[in-house]
Amino acid sequence: MLSYFAELVTRTDEDRRAFETHPVLIDAVAHGMNVQRYRALLLELYHVVWHFNPVSAAAASRMSDAWMPIRHFLYEHMHEESGHEVWVLNDLEAVGVAPEAVRAHAPAVH
């Protein structure tokens, strides 16, 4: 499992560094986030959180027993993440976005 984790860190290091040095992230950390930007972030986050469990379940169901530790890791995180989309919906409602509008919002494609 450790070798898998080490490989994962190595393969994603460049993207992690790009994320950590992105001007939008640096600005948000340094100056905070206005409501408009927070709302936009939450609208995108909703789709990530909402799709996490189905995607993880699909991945876990296709893994051979050789990948059982990863399968169990996914199952644990699916359990931990269950219901988090409700938190995002609640935060969006607090900044003036109705749940129906959130569900109708198409995520950005990058």
Predicted regions and their residues:
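Non-heme di-metal
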Residues: M1-H110
